[in-house]
């Protein structure tokens, strides 16, 4: 790890719950302008990794640096989208208020939001096609709509690094396509994104790089080098039944798409 200004550096990170280790000795460096997927079986520590980076779960050992800094002062450059299950959807707050929370890093918690902040929040809602729902209570929305709102909140933070914990879970195909389109747009602007993902059928198409995790780091690198039968087997072990076929199908699909683009 030779770049102090990498968006995300992790060294020898170990995390335990009730003295039971769930992550062991994780070493990672994520480069600027990459769209990175985190995959692995249930219980692999994927969400724990994201929460530890955000300071929501304490590390037992090792360290995390965001743009070369440790601690809370670095979080102003991070946009975070949590799992839907971790949110209290009954809290009486409007869609617009949720997105405005993403502006607190700019205005501070005790200062009033400005017209500019409201304008930014509305622009972000418009990007995810949720502006007509700005005054609606967040708990009255569908799962896919709620996920769009939290994505808008992350966009409102105008961050350089985005951490997203399974943003595609429970959404329809239209919402999923909208989300991946926004992620690619952010990447094109030089932003860095780390996304926990569970669907191997499209992982190779969605991401530039993959982190294969099962309590330990199995692999990290470009999808062509990491999304292989051998590394998937190491990651998922005996639970790997149809995943090798998925890997082959994804490779064939990418090949056919390339051939089609070259022939047109």
Description of each model-found segment:
Residues 137-141, 145:
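Conserved ABC ATPase signature
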């Amino acid at each position: 790890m030779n770049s102090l200004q990498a968006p995300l550096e992790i060294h020898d990170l170990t995390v335990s719950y009730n003295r039971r280790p769930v992550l062991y000795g994780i070493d990672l460096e994520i480069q600027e302008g990459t769209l990175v997927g985190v995959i692995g079986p249930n219980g692999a520590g994927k969400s724990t990794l994201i929460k530890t980076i955000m300071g929501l779960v304490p590390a037992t050992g090792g360290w995390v640096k965001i743009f070369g800094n440790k601690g809370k002062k670095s979080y102003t450059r991070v946009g975070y989208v949590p799992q839907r299950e971790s949110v209290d959807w009954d809290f009486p707050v409007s869609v617009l208020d949720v997105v405005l929370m993403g502006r607190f890093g700019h205005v501070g918690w005790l200062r009033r939001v400005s017209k500019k902040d409201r304008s930014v929040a509305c622009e972000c809602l418009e990007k995810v096609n949720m502006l007509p729902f700005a005054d609606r209570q967040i708990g009255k929305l569908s799962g896919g709509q709620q996920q769009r709102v939290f994505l808008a909140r992350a966009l409102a933070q105008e961050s350089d690094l985005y951490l997203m914990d399974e943003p595609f879970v429970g959404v329809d195909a239209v919402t999923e396509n909208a989300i991946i389109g926004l992620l690619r747009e952010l990447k094109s602007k030089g932003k860095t994104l780390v996304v926990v993902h569970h669907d191997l059928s499209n992982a190779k198409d969605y991401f530039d790089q993959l982190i294969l995790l099962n309590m330990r780091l199995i692999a990290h690198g470009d999808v062509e080098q990491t999304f292989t039968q051998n590394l998937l087997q190491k990651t998922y072990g005996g639970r790997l039944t149809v995943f090798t076929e998925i890997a082959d199908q994804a490779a064939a699909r990418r090949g056919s798409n390339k051939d089609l683009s070259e022939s047109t």
